[in-house]
Amino acid sequence: MKILYVTKALIAPPYAGCMQRTVHIARQLKPCGQVTMLAINRRFDSDSVNVCRQEFSRFDQILLRSYTDFPKRRGELLRKFHMHWPTLCGIRADRQGQALFETLAAQHDVIWFHTLGAAQPFSLPRTTPMVMDLDDLNHCKYEQSARIQTTLRFRLSAHVQSYKWKRLEREALKRYAAVVVCSEQDKQLLGGDDKIFVVPNGFTLPAEKPTCGPPDPLRLGFISHLAYGPNRDGLIWFRDRIWPLIRREKPNMCLRIVGRIPSDNDLIRAEGFEYLGYIDDPTEEIQRWSAMIVPIPYGGGTRIKILDAFSKCCPVVATSIGAYGIQGEHGRHFLLADEPQKFADYCLMLSSQPERGCQLADEAWALFCEKYTWDKIGRSIIAAAETVAKTPSTDVTGKP
């Protein structure tokens, strides 16, 4: 089988969850046969290109125009239009890019798109079976965002965006031979159709189980790419509503923040917040945390940061949305709180009772090994690809 894997999220370094999902799904597809990666974006970094060329037998790129390539006023109008009208979500490939895509599509048995944004720039073929990995359900993200907006304008905008994305996501069920989502909950939100495959996010299984503790009782941690809205808004909520409650009880508590920081303007500042930047292997750092916090107020898919904590035997305190899609139990695998005082209490408890944190971490490790290693998830990925490869070409609509 020959699989064309199309993505806008490259993989070096994998500082965002979508990048980790991209590389691991593409790797898990290799047992099916030859995998060609087609990357589309407005810019490429040399590290990502070099890694992809080493990872895959064939790697191609299509460079899309950027909004800044247009005259200033037109570029701004296009950006706003594409943001508010996801049906036309972005800039189309030029003739050369479309021709390359058509050539590759004709040479492969299955096309696997990572998100609707990877398919949008092209006119799609009518004869090659296609898989759409929705990753996040954007309609859920906007629906949840509407609940926390403080102005009528932003609430209405979020509701409208949610409606538009819901239509697009449901239309994907008609346009693609299979649709992939991150959780059983997401599958049911789309109607539970047999052509929907659940491929959860995962994490790499360490060579051996990490040691749990002893943590630093005055150290909490957060893994975040702050350019991503749910991460940024979640950290602001934590800073404003929860951090003062924690520091009132333990004035020397610090929050260690790991993740790429696009610019100083993206820093969310507070006394005790320590930014470490991107760390290629944060295992030793995470093992010193008394807990990893996941104060996410809205979003879709599943939180790779929680699975990262599970794989490193670090206890987790999260909001219910922060733990969405993960088949864990409150009080057994993690602690969940949507109310600021309760969230703060859980953080303080784990700081003072490391043995309780180790109990949570041990149960979370067992759950991770059972359900969330990429070796286990790979079975669902291969099943989706093999099922789609058998789809008669007449079942593929090819609508753009």
PLM region descriptions:
Residues 177, 287-301, 312-315:
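Acidic donor-binding loop of glycosyltransferase active sites
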Residues 334-341, 349-354:
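Conserved acidic donor-binding segment of nucleotide-sugar-dependent glycosyltransferases
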Residues 1-61, 106:
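N-terminal subdomain of nucleotide-sugar transferases
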Residues 131-132, 139, 159-166, 170-208:
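Donor nucleotide-sugar binding/catalytic pocket of nucleotide-sugar-dependent glycosyltransferases
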Residues 165, 198-288:
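Conserved catalytic-core segment of nucleotide-activated headgroup transferases in glycan assembly
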Residues 305-308, 315-319:
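Short hydrophobic beta-strand element within catalytic cores of glycosyltransferases
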Residues 8, 66-89, 130-170, 225, ...:
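Acceptor-binding helix/loop patch of EC 2.4 sugar-transfer enzymes
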Residues 349, 356-371, 380:
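A short, well-ordered alpha-helix in the C-terminal region of glycosyltransferases
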